[in-house]
């Protein structure tokens, strides 16, 4: 069963959409390459985007695209779908796709919740949410991406046994996420080392992570869809 685009109300889970002018080369890629690799803006079957894909992975809020591109490069047999509302991040990501000649990346420039709403049930094999906007002030917590209703939507689109990795460098957001994800009976911790500060073996460090803007060392959380 597919779900149509859902209204999100006035609350955005992300901040400003553009911080600086896009470089001419990146703008050219936004104009030419992005339309070729864009995700449909309506309910779709991921396998139609890459019929030969062995798995389908989703990264929500890919920032500059370093992590997404690196994961896609290591697994050319995987269709990597990424969603990012920040124009500069999308511009950086399409540059990575072009420079690395990646054929297995598809991008949505906009709210990831739309993509999740368009996906069929049990269609995603692995999910990444890496260092999302923390909205660390208490009065802004309601804007955080990880909310019970969204966790339920993630449970809908993830296959049984699918992995879900979340990373943050804000201690409160790590605890917030653990509480809300595990409150959904569809999820459990992946293993005894599901909460860690040391980067997992397959992690790719990003420029945002290196800036150390949070209030703690990075926390990596690994969940499994039951």
UniProtKB/Swiss-Prot annotation:
Molecular-function GO term, any one: tRNA (guanine(46)-N7)-methyltransferase activity
Residue positions binding substrate: 137, 169, 206-209
Keywords, alphabetical: Methyltransferase, S-adenosyl-L-methionine, Transferase, tRNA processing
The protein's name: tRNA (guanine-N(7)-)-methyltransferase
InterPro entries: SAM-dependent_MTases_sf, tRNA_(Gua-N-7)_MeTrfase_Trmb, tRNA_methyltr_TrmB_bact
Gene (name only): trmB
Active site (UniProt): 133
Listed pathway(s): tRNA modification; N(7)-methylguanine-tRNA biosynthesis
Catalytic activity: guanosine(46) in tRNA + S-adenosyl-L-methionine = N(7)-methylguanosine(46) in tRNA + S-adenosyl-L-homocysteine
Location of region: Interaction with RNA: 139-144
Positions that bind S-adenosyl-L-methionine: 59, 84, 111, 133
